[in-house]
């Protein structure tokens, strides 16, 4: 889809970036000459905006073979960042996509600044193209008119073509993997059961030559996975413990464990959700989607790391056999848990997932989960909540998130918090100490299963979906944390 080259070839559609108080230069200046100074005159007359992410459209009948030029404002060059580049590309490409253009030539060097070298600009372009052109895969009857979409992007640059092509590939992989996670999150619960999620993971494993293990209910019972099994008690759909193993080193050490919550629909159980709260609970497997999206990118990029993905999956339903408040269950770790709230089910499944990842050699753990409404109250819908038992690991995750352009914010774990999750007359732990500090209580509970293993918890309840369309795509699943996880895996030093 992306092709880097040095010599300008006349294509129907061109995209140029324009900094504030800038003139046309390089390849853009060459095109201006072919247009007899039309672009520079429009710039001089103020008919083309350099305001950040503002897109101007110019028709060019005088330039044979080139029908339309899009110019996107980039703002001040000294303030232009990698995230700005992604936004500007996304705004422009989304408009070009809506105009049903199938080919595009991008003057890459017009987007280069001191903060954004050519390779980064190429990554931003490819990632933004994939994200901004994403469309929800719905189940509506369609007309017989075939959809037209952007098929080929030609990247014109004076920089090293091999380096630019490599960056375009990485950006495309990041975007595609994020979109894969979005599609999973958007799928209805009746079309994405735990078995369906396991089949998807198995297909991913076959494509990228991962080792794949799918534990069935009988095997879980034999191992004593009381957390996941308790959540599954009310369901007619069998649970699955999904395990993918990618070995990028000669020996199985310094293993990164990625654990994703795979609750394919959450009624809340007997602690049933409200009418407004239950709609949208098909997305309660957002953590699993993020982990699977990350594994797709890892399969494409083949980093020299060892990665273990663990996804405990089921739905949380109501029936005569469903778990009840006051029940006591025994987790895979051997720790007992008193159930005070059946809607605090994700942490039960994750408890077994974290333990299973440790049993299979995980040196560090990162769990991703749409875990609590409390994190949405605390941090809103743009920032993912994070908790940890190991600050050096958290700093690596934070740096990866910053590089990927995904906001996270650390919440505390205190000794008083630990006492609250241990406050039970009947068991080692309780699964819901109360509404106060709800997001913190959930993370603290998970920390009891990470134990001494370095661990970071990412609560994406507020960020896994969006209610607004944006330049990065339609409302629905966001694929949040896919890019953070992949960046973390690629950068992980192992020195903690």
From Swiss-Prot:
Enzyme Commission identifier(s): 3.4.11.1, 3.4.11.10
Entry keyword set: Aminopeptidase, Cytoplasm, Hydrolase, Manganese, Metal-binding, Protease
Annotated localization: Cytoplasm
Disulfide bonds: none
Major subcellular location class: cytoplasm
Sequence similarity: Belongs to the peptidase M17 family.
Protein name: Probable cytosol aminopeptidase
Gene source species: Bacillus licheniformis (strain ATCC 14580 / DSM 13 / JCM 2505 / CCUG 7422 / NBRC 12200 / NCIMB 9375 / NCTC 10341 / NRRL NRS-1264 / Gibson 46)
The encoding gene: pepA
């Amino acid at each position: 889809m992306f092709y880097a080259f040095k010599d300008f070839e006349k294509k129907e559609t061109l995209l140029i970036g324009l900094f504030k108080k800038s003139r046309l230069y390089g390849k853009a200046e060459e095109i201006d000459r072919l247009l007899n100074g039309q672009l520079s005159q429009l710039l001089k007359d103020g008919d083309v905006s350099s305001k950040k992410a503002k897109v101007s459209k110019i028709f060019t009948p005088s330039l044979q073979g080139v029908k339309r030029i899009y110019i996107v404002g980039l703002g001040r060059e000294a303030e232009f960042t990698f995230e700005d580049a992604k936004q500007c590309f996304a705004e422009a490409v989304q408009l070009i996509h809506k105009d049903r253009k199938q080919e595009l030539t991008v003057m890459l060097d017009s987007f280069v600044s001191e903060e954004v070298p050519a390779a980064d600009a190429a990554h931003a372009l490819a990632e933004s193209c994939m994200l901004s052109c994403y469309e929800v895969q719905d189940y509506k009857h369609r007309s017989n008119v075939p959809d037209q979409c952007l098929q080929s992007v030609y990247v014109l640059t004076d920089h090293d073509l091999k380096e630019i092509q490599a960056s375009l590939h990485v950006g495309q992989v990041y975007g595609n993997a994020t979109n894969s996670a979005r599609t999973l999150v958007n799928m209805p619960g009746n079309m994405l059961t735990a078995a369906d999620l396991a089949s998807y993971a198995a297909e991913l494993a076959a494509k990228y030559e991962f080792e794949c293990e799918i534990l069935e209910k009988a095997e879980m019972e034999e191992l004593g996975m009381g957390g996941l099994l308790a959540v599954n008690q009310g369901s007619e759909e069998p649970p699955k413990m999904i395990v993918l193993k990618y070995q990028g080193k000669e020996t199985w050490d310094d293993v990164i464990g990625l654990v994703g919550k795979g609750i394919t629909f959450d009624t809340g159980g007997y602690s049933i959700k409200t009418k407004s709260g239950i709609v949208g609970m098909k997305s309660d497997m957002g953590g699993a989607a993020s982990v699977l999206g990350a594994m797709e990118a890892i399969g494409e990029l083949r980093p020299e790391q060892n990665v273990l993905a663990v996804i405990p999956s089921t739905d949380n339903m109501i029936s005569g056999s469903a778990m009840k408040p006051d029940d006591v269950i025994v987790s895979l770790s051997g720790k007992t848990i008193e159930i005070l709230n059946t809607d605090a089910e994700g942490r039960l499944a994750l408890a077994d997932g974290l333990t299973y990842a440790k049993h299979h050699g995980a040196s560090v753990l990162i769990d991703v989960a749409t875990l609590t409404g409390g994190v949405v109250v605390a941090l809103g819908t743009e920032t993912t909540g994070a908790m940890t038992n190991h600050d050096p690991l958290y700093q690596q995750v934070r740096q990866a998130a910053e590089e990927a352009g995904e906001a996270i914010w650390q919440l505390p774990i205190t000794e008083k918090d630990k006492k609250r999750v241990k406050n039970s007359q009947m068991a080692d732990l309780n699964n819901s100490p109360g509404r106060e500090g709800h997001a913190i209580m959930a993370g603290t509970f998970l920390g009891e299963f990470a134990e001494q293993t370095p661990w970071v918890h990412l609560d994406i309840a507020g960020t896994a979906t969006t209610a607004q369309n944006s330049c990065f795509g339609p409302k629905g699943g966001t694929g949040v944390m896919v890019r953070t996880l992949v960046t973390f895996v690629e950068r992980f030093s192992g020195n903690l």
